[in-house]
């Protein structure tokens, strides 16, 4: 009996230690490096879109690091409102220039920037998903302190990590509403879901607990922001958009959770894109082409790196960036309702 108990305790301790090591590895691998995009990919700029103007802007975030981006606008356009955009994990805001241009052409100014540790902004590393909330709040304060934006309604817009940031910045002064596409509940949850959760779902809670601890050690009492709790606290209008085939921010464990609680809420509009994955603002064909393209390149890298590099040069960007007009129209109409005070 005693021996059996010792075996059980030892086995349990070994599992806990293994999950701790995994959580520490995941935390460091994701958060402790910069994200400058893929040097072989083309990231669109304002020059790629007729009539789109980009004015450089910069501002300071929480630790004095400079964040850089652009104010996107059309010449001689009286803007309906200012849209403040938070990008997703990885490449910086220029991975979304096509979508930003669509919003500008609909009559908005768009303030978009690169988060700490990403692309053109300062920071030796990403620090963590909670850092994005600090950065977005800094962007909002920058906009609130600029005389040129006085009297303009301000709308938050974000995708993935950016949507998480948006949902946790709703109560900043001057924000009239928000659009959140494919946002996750918390940083610790989404990391554990995408690592141990894929192979040993029963241990997801344990890795999440360790990740929460690491985030607390890094960000203090404001660590571990929770999008569900933040959305419960606001009365501002919010549009939630999810693809029900999303496996990056697992739909059943994130989007479906939001929709079960908030669909029908007076201030929340929900849109589920059937058959869409993590980029619901794209057409299904564009999502499929993107996945096939990058899967083929990844497979080729294992065989012949130089041939994989050559494949980047043959990417059909028009095909993989084709927007879903209905989704983008929904976003713009929602922003229109906010700018009109409806």
Predicted regions and their residues:
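The serine-hydrolase catalytic nucleophile loop
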Residues: 89-102, 115, 252
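Catalytic active-site module of serine/aspartate enzymes centered on a nucleophile-bearing elbow/loop
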Residues: 284-342
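An N-terminal hydrophobic leader/cap segment in hydrolases
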Residues: 3-60, 70, 295-310
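Hydrolase active-site cap/lid region
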Residues: 168-220
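Alpha/beta-hydrolase active-site loop
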Residues: 126-147
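Short beta-strand/loop motif that positions the catalytic acidic residue
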Residues: 234-235, 240-246
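Conserved alpha/beta-hydrolase
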Residues: 100-122
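Short alpha-helix in the alpha/beta-hydrolase fold that links the catalytic acid
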Residues: 236, 250-261, 285
